[in-house]
């Protein structure tokens, strides 16, 4: 049996918890057990499993593990006057926190936007919470796909590894939200969406939309890779 790897941003938490467990065992067995459990939970929270990624640049994959909470048409967050479809995904404490690039293309911008730390499940979190917003110009069709990592009550540390001007590959790791929260992805209105509210999605694996209007062509003879 193999165990999933750990994301590098999890090691400080795991090492600190492990050190506390060693000190705890030196003081009392019960205290040591408590910190050992915390160490195991940290390792679980920061797990980074291999994913089976579709090798098709015409697809849009889920950027995170979680549950689709809403699919609505809204004004573009880029304030360009366009209408887009926003797909919101809620990440619980028990979901994988590592985020994945939703579409292949070139990163046009990465912006940190300060804000509040409301519950990720609340309506105010959509527009008011602190976030990191990345814009990717898709290699197929030249669409601007916007993806947002949103902070929450517990998730107050967002890490985004994307860099403006660099290429981004569908399914590759793009960062992490510590201890669960929410992600939004904005795609052009009218683009075929493959999920519905309430669906459980897997980051980098679950196909949520297509850049090609002909879904039959897009899904024909798909190949995959493990990343």
From Swiss-Prot:
What does this protein need as cofactor?
A: pyruvate
Q: Which PANTHER family match?
A: ARCHAETIDYLSERINE DECARBOXYLASE PROENZYME-RELATED
Location in or out of the cell: Cell membrane
Report how it sits in the membrane: Peripheral membrane protein
Instruction: Write out the catalytic residues in the record.
Output: 181 (schiff-base intermediate with substrate)
Its PTM note reads: Is synthesized initially as an inactive proenzyme. Formation of the active enzyme involves a self-maturation process in which the active site pyruvoyl group is generated from an internal serine residue via an autocatalytic post-translational modification. Two non-identical subunits are generated from the proenzyme in this reaction, and the pyruvate is formed at the N-terminus of the alpha chain, which is derived from the carboxyl end of the proenzyme.
Instruction: From the Swiss-Prot or TrEMBL record, give the protein name.
Output: Phosphatidylserine decarboxylase proenzyme
Which reaction does this chain catalyze? a 1,2-diacyl-sn-glycero-3-phospho-L-serine + H(+) = a 1,2-diacyl-sn-glycero-3-phosphoethanolamine + CO2
Site entry: Cleavage (non-hydrolytic)? 180-181
Q: What does this protein do?
A: Catalyzes the formation of phosphatidylethanolamine (PtdEtn) from phosphatidylserine (PtdSer).
């Amino acid at each position: 049996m193999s165990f999933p790897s750990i994301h590098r941003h999890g090691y400080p938490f795991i090492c600190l918890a492990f050190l506390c467990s060693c000190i705890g065992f030196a003081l009392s067995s019960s205290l040591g057990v408590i910190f050992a459990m915390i160490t195991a939970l940290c390792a679980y929270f920061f797990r980074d499993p291999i994913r089976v990624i579709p090798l098709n640049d015409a697809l849009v994959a889920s950027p995170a593990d979680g549950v689709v909470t809403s699919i609505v048409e809204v004004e573009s967050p880029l304030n360009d006057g366009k209408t887009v479809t926003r797909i919101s995904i809620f990440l619980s404490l028990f979901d994988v926190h590592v985020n994945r690039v939703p579409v292949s293309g070139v990163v046009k911008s990465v912006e940190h936007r300060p804000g509040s730390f409301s519950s990720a499940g609340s309506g105010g979190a959509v527009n008011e919470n602190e976030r990191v917003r990345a814009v990717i110009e898709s290699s197929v069709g030249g669409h601007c796909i916007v993806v947002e990592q949103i902070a929450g009550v517990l998730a107050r540390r967002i890490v985004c590894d994307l860099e403006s001007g660099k290429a981004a590959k569908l399914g590759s790791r793009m960062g992490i939200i510590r201890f669960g929260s929410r992600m939004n992805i904005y795609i052009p209105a009218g683009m075929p969406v493959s999920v519905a509210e309430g669906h459980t999605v897997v980051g980098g694996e679950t196909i949520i939309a297509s850049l090609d209007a002909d879904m039959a062509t897009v899904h024909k003879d798909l190949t995959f890779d493990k990343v």
